[in-house]
């Protein structure tokens, strides 16, 4: 099967899973070449295609170049037979899907980064940031908990780009932050997350759920 394009990124990159999952549903092959952050994305060849030097970055076989993970995910979702499922069949369903994609990007992902970076050695613990970020994450999860009913997805009965984006956004959170006591507070969110990442069509992308018993606590 012909490659749909090349995705430049370090791995694991939480912003990439939604792209790869959308490709999987659309039966599209995306290649991920060897990549060294701070080297590959600073090369003259890379910058000639992607001036911002950011990843993920997508290049099609025709030379079409695209950056920003949501834009790449949208393009991949729209480029295959499951486009209407992933992006909606009409203006209202498409808007609902876009609503949740925006919610994850604006309300949850920055908070997850604040909480995860020091836990993986990419920053120092800051108590003020930690308290604020935990409160923001709790807010985001509470909104989701109220919206989700047991066993349902975000906007209907089938996986959409909203679900894939949400699962990608929360992947690191479940790996590092949302421990057993916290999961008990948001049973609908946990059930939805597991339903998405364990879906037969995309579970190969997300891998086995890596849920933690107790999150790491920073020293004051």
Swiss-Prot record:
GO biological process assignments: translational elongation
EC annotation from Swiss-Prot or TrEMBL: 2.5.1.-
Gene3D superfamilies, per the entry: 1.20.1050.10, Glutaredoxin
Cellular compartments per GO CC: cytoplasm; nucleus
Root EC class: transferase
Entries under InterPro entries matching the protein: EF-GSTs, Glutathione-S-Trfase_C-like, Glutathione-S-Trfase_C_sf, Glutathione_S-Trfase, Glutathione_S-Trfase_N, GST_C, Thioredoxin-like_sf
Keywords per UniProt: Transferase
GST C-terminal domain location: 90-220
UniProt keyword annotation of Ubl conjugation present: no
GO MF terms, alphabetically ordered: transferase activity
Superkingdom, natural source: Eukaryota
SUPFAM superfamilies the record matches: GST C-terminal domain-like, Thioredoxin-like
Domain GST N-terminal stretches: 3-84
Xref: CDD domains: GST_C_EF1Bgamma_like (cd03181), GST_N_EF1Bgamma (cd03044)
Family designation: Belongs to the GST superfamily.
Job description of the protein: Glutathione S-transferase-like protein; part of the gene cluster that mediates the biosynthesis of the mycotoxin fusarin C. Within the cluster, FUS1, FUS2, FUS8 and FUS9 are sufficient for fusarin production. The other FUS cluster members are not essential for fusarin C biosynthesis.
Protein's name in the database: Glutathione S-transferase-like protein FUS3
Gene that produces this protein: FUS3
